[in-house]
C-alpha cells in the first residue's frame, strides 16, 4: 500500500511540473475568460461523468464567490438541468446535449469550456 501511495505522489509531482510549462497558455485562456465576463458575456461549462460535476462546481464559484466578495459573474453549467438534458437526448440524441443549450442560451462573445 505504501508503494502505491508513493507512486501516486510521484506521478502527481510529474504532472504539476509539466503544468508549469503551460503558464503562457493558461494566461491566454484566463485573459479570454476575463474579457468575456467584462463584456457582460457568459461562460458556459460542460463535461460528462465527474467532469460534469467539475463544470457545475466552476460555474457555482463564478456565480457565488471564490475569493473575496464581488458581484456574481455570468456562468452556467450545461450539466445541471436534468429535464433539459433528458429532453434533448430523447428528442435529438446525445450528440446535441450541449450544442442545443448553447443555441438557446448563448450569445456572440460567450465562451464554452468543455472539461474532460
Predicted segments, located by residue:
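Residue-level recognition of alpha-helical structural elements
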Residues: 1, 22-26, 51
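Generic N-terminal amphipathic, Lys/Arg-enriched alpha-helix
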Residues: 1-21
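A short, well-structured juxtamembrane/interface segment
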Residues: 20-39
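Glycine-rich, small/polar surface segments that engage phosphate groups of diverse ligands
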Residues: 35-106
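C-terminal binding/interaction regions
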Residues: 108-116
